């Protein structure tokens, strides 16, 4: 199966990043969001990234012009998914919202299109099972910033077809990502491990174990992490981390209990 047209639903940080790399690959890419202000912000995010690349000599103006031709911005979901080979949902981590979108996608997307969710923690089965085509639905978890981070976590559920898995792996390869394949368990492989580290770092900060800067430095120099857990929590967004923690707490109890509001505020302390 070839990739010619991709639709990305949700123009936030993740959605705009996914749309950007698809356009750079040469695929006709449609970025869709129901809120015009969100769509405009997504457009600005992409423009800003490309302009930075030009200033640093990593991108040319000609490349930007070519990539821009591959991008279309839509408010209407039906228009966005028309003729798409792949639809990637990247809306906030709210299960009912994702279910609603996939119910719509089953109706309006091409019947041979692969339908992916970029969720970082929500069960793929819980999304797929609201449709009558679960075999076409898969998790494709990208990482922020999408154009830079090399990992793509592919999440298969029990009803996912081998064809769908192979297609997702092919897309990852074409986009220059290193793919891992994991089972549909709470938090998958990355969030299940990652939020524990971030959660504990926030607790350590609130207990006065060390400063934010020193906690981050401990992991960067002691374990070769490119970014400290508190820095990463701020980059991902404490609201996103909270949603992931709340989701995982239902399955793993105290290990993933969200820190208190006071602890969260402290995590925003300068890292340097």
Q: In which residue ranges do the predicted regions lie?
A:
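NAD(P)+-binding Rossmann beta1-loop-alpha1 motif at the extreme N-terminus of oxidoreductases
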Residues: 1-52, 56
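Short loop/edge segments at beta-strand edges and connector loops
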Residues: 75, 117, 183
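Rossmann-fold NAD(P)-binding glycine/threonine-rich loop
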Residues: 100-148, 158-164
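Acidic/polar active-site rim loop that often engages polyanionic ligands
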Residues: 145-154, 225-227, 246
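Conserved small/polar residues in nucleotide/adenosyl-binding loops
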Residues: 256-263
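Hydrophobic alpha-helical segments, chiefly the membrane-spanning helices
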Residues: 267-272
């Amino acid at each position: 199966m070839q990739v010619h047209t991709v639709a990305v639903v949700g123009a936030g940080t993740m959605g705009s990043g996914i749309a950007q790399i698809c356009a750079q690959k040469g695929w006709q890419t449609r970025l869709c969001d129901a809120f015009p202000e969100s769509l405009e912000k997504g457009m600005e995010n992409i423009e800003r990234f490309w302009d930075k690349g030009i200033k640093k000599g990593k991108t040319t103006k000609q490349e930007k012009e070519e990539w821009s031709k591959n991008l279309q911005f839509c408010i209407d979901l039906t228009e966005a998914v028309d003729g798409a080979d792949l639809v990637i949902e990247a809306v906030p981590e709210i299960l009912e919202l994702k279910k609603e979108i996939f119910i719509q996608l089953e109706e309006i997307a091409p019947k041979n299109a692969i339908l992916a969710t970029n969720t970082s923690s929500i069960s793929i089965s819980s999304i797929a099972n609201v449709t009558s085509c679960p075999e076409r639905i898969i998790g494709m978890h990208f990482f922020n910033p999408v154009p830079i981070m090399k990992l793509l976590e592919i999440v298969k559920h029990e009803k996912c077809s081998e064809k769908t898995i192979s297609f997702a792996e092919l897309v990852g390869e074409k986009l220059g990502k290193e793919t891992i394949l994991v089972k549909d368990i709470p938090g998958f492989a990355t969030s299940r491990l990652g939020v524990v580290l971030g959660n504990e770092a926030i607790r350590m900060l609130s207990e006065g174990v060390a400063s934010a800067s020193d906690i981050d430095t401990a992991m960067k120099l002691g374990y070769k992490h490119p970014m400290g857990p508190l820095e990463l929590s701020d980059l991902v967004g404490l609201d996103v981390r909270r949603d992931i923690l709340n989701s995982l707490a239902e399955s793993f109890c105290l290990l993933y209990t969200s820190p208190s509001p006071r602890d969260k505020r402290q995590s925003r302390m300068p890292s340097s």
